[in-house]
Amino acid sequence: MELINKKIMVTGGCSGIGRELVEKLIAEGSLVGILDINKSAFSEIEKISPNVYCMECDITNPSSVEDSVEKFHKLHGSIDILVNNAGILYSSPLVGITLQGLKKHGYKEWTKVIDTNLNSLFYVTSNVVEKMLEQRVKGVIVNISSVCSAGNAGQSAYSAAKAGVNALTSTWSKELSSIGIRVVGISPGYIDTSSTRKALSVSNIQNIRQEIPLKRLAQVSEIIDAILFVIKNDYFNGKILEIDGGLIVS
């Protein structure tokens, strides 16, 4: 699939991987719609190109999602590709030992991570696929997962959410492939971003680097290259592409 003139929706496109992905898609000639709650970044991003359209959207709110998808669809008449990129990191053991005593993983934090990283995926994808089916679009759904989907100490909510993302990728591929919609996933390892540095201590990051055979974190551009690969390769379907520098095999 070529990207020129394709109508693409990206969740969480105002920062991090999403922001750089949007710029790359624009350079490829795509028409991009961003779903993001960070309205303050819209004016700067929309200066990049007239072909990017920002929509304030709480992806954990089904009504907000439905309205945003409808707006983009009315603007361009169709939706070809969805990249479910938005997500948050949160690290906490199930029950931690602190100087003040035992501390359980917060229920509020659990719900927020699951809502943002998993439930939102269902809300956005169901609305986009509905539009695709109405117009018989042969589209692509890209879900951003994580190597933590296999389980990672201290990340109960995040790991559970990303495991769910993998399950939905497989399930939706089995449902939608016969009608021309591919569903694929990207499973990055640890990426050199501000959110990673915020979620993990310096010593944790140093230890992670030593566990990765390439001895470094991934660059955002390397993850974006993988996203573009799974979109453009028409025979890649129903699978999760791991981009982790060899972390899993080590």
Language-model-detected regions and their locations in the chain:
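Canonical Rossmann dinucleotide-binding motif of NAD(H)/NADP(H)-dependent dehydrogenases/reductases
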Residues: L3-G33
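The beta1-alpha1 cofactor-binding region of Rossmann-like NAD(H)/NADP(H)-dependent oxidoreductases
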Residues: C57-S68, Y107, E222
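Catalytic Tyr-X3-Lys loop
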Residues: I88, L102-Y123, V142, V165
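Conserved mid-core segment of classical short-chain dehydrogenase/reductases
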Residues: L89-T111, G154-A157, R197-L200
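Short, small/polar-rich loop/turn modules that mediate ligand/substrate recognition or access, typified
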Residues: S177-R182, F236-G238
